[in-house]
């Protein structure tokens, strides 16, 4: 029950601050909601930007994904898809990066659900149209690619080969 209370409080906090500020990435969010509930954000964003079209989509943290910040996986029949967010890359980044990564992946999910677009790397005109629309409304800076290169490099696994007697 405590988890539900936290989700309700997080959603309530999100709604009340959203009414005061049009920007989803306003710096004050870092103090108001520094560790947001991604599921609550997903539901809010789905209603606000995608007319509820992503009801068949799930969002979850990936504890081992370190080569990208987010990924949208298409589950096939029925328009089901899953958004995975990199817990290692996003958990220590500003809230703004989580919001923009989630919205980026939600655009991919929306294009799949509405147009059956299965191009995971597709950032063409339809993607960019939605990206610009949301950036304008929410004052975000959703981009085609993230800039977490230092973090990705930090998580890269290195294989060492012994060149002498081991």
Residues covered by each model-derived region:
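Solvent-exposed, charged interface segments at domain starts and junctions
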Residues: 1-2, 97-100
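Mixed-charge, low-complexity intrinsically disordered regions
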Residues: 1-3, 8-9, 13
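Metalloprotease/metallohydrolase-associated module, dominated by Zn2+-dependent proteases
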Residues: 11-97, 113-166
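Active-site recognition of the HExxH zinc-binding catalytic motif
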Residues: 100-113
